[in-house]
Amino acid sequence: MSARKRVKRANVYDLYRTCKQAGTCPPDVIPKVEGDTIADKILKLGGLAIYLGGLGIGTWSTGRVAAGGSPRYVPLRTSGSTTSLASVGSRAGAATGTRSSITGIPLDTLETIGALRPGAYEDTVLPEAPAIVTPDAVPADTGIDGLSIGTDSSTETLITLLEPEGPEDVAVLELQPLDHANWQVSNAVHQGSAYHAPLQLQSSIAETSGLENIFVGGAGLGDTGGENIELTFFGSPRTSTPRNLPQTARGILNWFSKRYYTQIPTEDPDVFSSQTFSNPLYDPEPAVLKGPSGRVGLSQVYRPDFIETRGGGQVGPQLHVRYSLSTITEDVEAIPIAVDEDTQGLAFIPLHEEPGDFEEIELDDLGEEHALLPKSYTAPIGSGVRRALIPGQGFSATRPTGVVTYGSPDMYPASPVGPDSTSPSLVIDDNTTTPIIIIDGHTVDLYSNNYSLHPSLLRKRKKRKHA
C-alpha cells in the first residue's frame, strides 16, 4: 500500500477569511490571526509589570539620560512651528546648568545654516497667512555668511511684433463644381440567336438594343496571322502506380528487403483468398507500394515454419508472397467483329433523302371565289394596322371584305368577314403614326424580309373576366 501524499495547507490568513463566518476554522488559526496565542499573552502580562518607556529605546540616545532632565531626544518640527533646533538646545542647557552639545557638531553653527531652520520665505507660508502672496511682500534672503550673491531684477520687457511679409490682400478663389449631364447607357445581349446583327447605335430615339460579339481568331481581329502549333501527345503512363509515391519504409517494415524476407513471386491470385492479420489497429495506413518490376500488386507476409518461445515470440524465416498485376498495354487497335453466317443482312438507311417534286403554285392565282370584290380598303405604309379575331356567330352587323395595298399596284385580297365567318379580319385604326423601335441597331421595317412583325400586328390577349 502506497503512502498517502501530504498536501500543504493553505495560508492561515486565507483560511481565516473563509472559515471565520462559517465557524469551521481549525483551533490554531483564530488565535494566530487575532494575536491571542500563548506568546502574545506572556508579552501582554510582562508589559503590565515592567515599564521600559524611560530607557529611550529607538531615540538615538543609547539609553543615556541627562541628570535631572529628559533624554537628549529632540522631536521633529511640526507644521506651523517656528522654533529652531538651536533654541531648543539652548533652553535645555540653561535648565540643566550644563551646555548640551553633540560631538562633532557645534550648536553655534546650526543657527546660521538655513537647511535646518525655517527661512524667511518659509515663515510666511503659514496656515493663518493669506492664500495670495504678492512678490513685493517677500523679503530678500540674506543667504549664508561668507557668500555674496548678487541678483539684478529687471521689470522692463521688450515685445516686438513681426508683421508678415507680402501683400496685405489675400486672394480668394471660388471653386464651383462642374455640372455633368446624367447619362444612362443600357445594353442587352441576346443569347442563342441565329443571326447576329452588327452594333450600330446612331440614334437615341425610343428604346434601343444591341448585340455585341467578339470573335477570337476571325477576320475581325485583322489579318495579322498567327503560328500554328501542332498538338503533341506525351507518353501515357506505363504502370498504374500513382505519381506521388509514398516514402519507402526501411528495415523490417520494408517487405521488399531481402535481408528480412524471402521474396517469392507468384502467379496464383488464390493465395490471397484468406488473408489474416494479427491486429489491424496497429497496422500502418494502407499505401500503394511499387515493386522492383515497376508494377502494383498484392503482397502478403507470413511465416510458414516457425518456433514459438515461451514469451510468445516467433523464430523462423519470413516469406513475402507477391502477385504483380499486369502492365498497361499499348492502345488497342480495332478488333474485327466476327459475323455469323446465320446473321441477316443489315438494311442501309440514308441520313439525307433526296427531296421530291414540289407543286408550284402561282401567287397571282386568286381563285374564283375572289374574282369579284364589291369593296376594298387601302392602308398607306406606316399606318397602324392590327389583326383582330371577330367571332361570326351572334354578330349582327355585316362587314365587307377588306383589301390592303403594300406600296405596290398589286391588290392582295383579305378574307371576307360576315356574320357566318370566323376568319380574322383587318381593322384599320384612325391613328396613322407608327412608333419607331430600334432592334439590334436597325429600324424595324414592317414590309422587308427580316421576319419581324410589328407589335401592332400581333394579337392582344384579353384577360378572361371571372363572374
UniProtKB/Swiss-Prot annotation:
Highly phosphorylated. InterPro entries: Late_L2. One of its GO terms (cellular component) is host cell. It comes from the Viruses. Its main location: virion. Pfam families: Late_protein_L2. A motif (Nuclear localization signal) lies at residues 1-10, 459-466. It is found in: Virion; Host nucleus; Host early endosome; Host Golgi apparatus. This is Minor capsid protein L2. It comes from Bos taurus papillomavirus 2 (Bovine papillomavirus 2). The gene is L2.
